[in-house]
Amino acid sequence: VSKLDCIKSYLLVGGTALSLQMGTRQSEDLDFMKWRTSKTEKMEVAWYQIEKELAVIGDIQHKDILDIDHVEYLVSGVKFSFYACPKYSPVSMPVEYLNKLRLADVKSIGAMKMEVMLRRSNFRDYYDIYSILKSGVPINDLVSLALTYSGHTLKSKNLLAMLTNSSRFTRDYHFEQLAPIYAVTAQEIEDYIKFCLL
């Protein structure tokens, strides 16, 4: 995968990018994102080119063109997603990882995980934020970057209310399959976040 030309303009984000940098849990899919660099830029995914390259490395079992800017593939049992985000990138320093594979940095991943809480309540996102905080990233840095990344549609008060409401998150059997290194409950994560906010 790291040698594919189609990933050059994208960064690997999400759980897999975090796992490669911190090793706090396994991840199952490869999420690639690119962001707007100018107001006039058309945010599209060149799915035809991507598909041609993915077909070389494995069997394309499923394709889902969700929109002009978002496509997902299942290649030999591995989920790939490519998303051209209309926002500006939260990543100031991409991590050069291997060949053409570049990763979003840990702080940016944390901010994106916080921003996605507007749309979903996955325990793995809550766990990842906990892992990032445990690694020493200050919570105020994450909150500030998340608010900026959301275009300030996310308000500090609302984000902190979401982060300190562990009842939204349930650690399930599926999460256990990801071999998390921290044996924490949602309540323990909430308590730690409150401690970080003191």
Put a short name on every predicted segment.
Residues 1-198:
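Compositionally biased terminal segments of proteins
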